[in-house]
């Protein structure tokens, strides 16, 4: 099995916490949130995964949504953080801080590894 950089560097388990963080900053609709996740390292080819996460957060009572009709274009579901969502966000910080420590240890140990050995093939005679 080979791990890609995106599988390791951007664990899917961080998406709900990142969505809660973004909604604590300001409410938003799915496409906005998808764009706001990009600087955090998450980039999807479509909004499906974001809407699934938002639906799960709403079912858990961590976010609410309202239908907003804009002056132009179709209406959109706008998501907001609830008090329970803020409490969940506050609790998630300890877990994220733990990940930060784990990543720091991982990188430190990786940097101390000896360089890879090269194998020399002998030419066939």
List each language-model region with its residue ranges.
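Basic, amphipathic "hinge/linker" alpha-helix immediately C-terminal to the N-terminal HTH DNA-binding motif
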Residues: 75-93
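Amphipathic alpha-helical dimerization/coiled-coil segments
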Residues: 87-125
């Amino acid at each position: 099995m080979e791990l890609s950089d995106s599988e390791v560097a951007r664990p899917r388990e961080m998406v709900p916490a990142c969505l809660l963080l973004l909604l604590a900053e300001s409410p938003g609709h799915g496409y906005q949130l998808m764009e706001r996740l990009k600087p955090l390292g998450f980039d999807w080819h479509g909004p499906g995964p974001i809407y699934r996460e938002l639906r799960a957060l709403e079912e858990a009572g961590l976010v609410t949504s309202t239908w907003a009709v804009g002056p132009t274009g179709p209406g959109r579901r706008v998501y907001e953080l609830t008090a329970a969502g803020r409490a969940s966000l506050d609790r998630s910080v300890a877990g994220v801080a733990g990940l930060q420590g784990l990543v720091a240890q991982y990188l430190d140990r990786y940097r101390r590894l000896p360089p890879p050995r090269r194998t020399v093939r002998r030419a066939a005679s």
